[in-house]
Amino acid sequence: MSELRINKTLNTPEIVFDPDQGILSIEGRSIPENPNDFYTPLFKWMDTYFDESPQEKTRINIKLEYINSGSSKFLLQFLRYIKQKYDEGNECIVNWYYEEDDEAVQELGEHYRSSVKLPFNMIDYID
């Protein structure tokens, strides 16, 4: 399985998934006009990964500077999907990065953490 790379734009985050390392990174702004069209390939890619060659541990690193409501709904769906894979025996961990003074992104991460109930680290940083 090859690497998935979706380049960042003004409205969409960079998505990099390295199946050999089991690391998915989502970074940037997430305000696409149609979140379903943007994120559906990621679901398909992750399905193939978990069906064919999951690593011992899968890490999901999320570092968003801004996210709109449509993307937020998708992301919750995606994290529920990861929770399902976790419940099926795949070791998964989410690392949610937020700027030290960005309460909105921090609170969103805390909401996701309490909603999906899987290993979920809240990591603050200074930009």
Task: Outline where the language-model segments fall.
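Short, aliphatic-rich beta-strand segments
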Residues: 22-28
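Amphipathic alpha-helical interaction surfaces in cytosolic regulatory modules
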Residues: 37, 42, 62-112
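A generic structural motif
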Residues: 30-32, 66
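A general structural motif
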Residues: 21, 55-59, 89-93
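A short, well-ordered alpha-helical element
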Residues: 12-15, 33-56
